[in-house]
């Protein structure tokens, strides 16, 4: 049953070093420019799509995060505090909220809709609601990726995220006989674990 595949989520949380998924699928230029948070989100999303057997370039996507790339935000703040502020173009283009969506469309060649949402401590629920709303209206599947990394100080004091991680899910509206129950398959990155978090019968 699908709920048996969610059993790892019921285990007590254990801190572990965050392992970023391999980013071989990224073109060299994007691999150099993408920060840790973006590589984490893309890697987890790419794993979920590969596990689902879907074509990454043909599905809508929703990315959800508390702060997207906190390290990049921190570096920009430090640069702006200098006597003569200088800001690299890479830092600037990675600072926009939907940077990860942009990287995703570059990597996959997707012309499908892509959305980036932010929502503080409620981000998982907000991302899931957005993905389910899109799945209910769309003719095809939707990818949801929820991700966060640990913020550096002083941002950590404002919003302490104890550990980074990501979870991704692909799903679509169920058939009428399933009463609209969503079907999906997913992948999680929590420390050095990769686990299947599918919600399928």
Where are these regions (language model features)?
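Active-site-proximal alpha-helical scaffold in enzymes
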Residues: 41-46, 51-53, 116-142
């Amino acid at each position: 049953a699908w709920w048996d595949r969610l059993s790892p989520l019921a285990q007590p949380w254990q801190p572990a070093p965050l392992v970023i998924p391999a980013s071989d699928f990224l073109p060299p230029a994007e691999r150099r420019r993408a920060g840790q948070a973006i590589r984490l989100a893309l890697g987890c999303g790419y794993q979920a799509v590969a596990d689902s057997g879907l074509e990454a370039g043909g599905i809508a996507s929703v990315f959800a995060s508390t702060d997207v790339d906190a390290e990049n935000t921190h570096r920009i703040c430090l640069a702006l505090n200098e006597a003569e502020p200088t800001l690299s173009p890479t830092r600037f283009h990675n600072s926009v909220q939907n940077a990860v969506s942009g990287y995703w469309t570059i990597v996959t060649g997707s012309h499908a809709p892509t959305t980036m949402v932010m929502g503080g401590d409620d981000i998982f629920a907000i991302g899931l609601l957005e993905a389910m709303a899109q799945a209910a209206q769309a003719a095809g599947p939707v990818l949801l990726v929820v991700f966060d990394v640990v913020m550096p100080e002083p941002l950590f004091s404002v919003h302490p995220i104890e550990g980074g991680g990501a979870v991704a899910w692909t799903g679509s509206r169920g058939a009428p006989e399933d009463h609209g129950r969503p079907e999906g398959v997913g992948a999680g990155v929590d420390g050095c674990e990769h686990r299947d978090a599918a919600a399928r019968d």
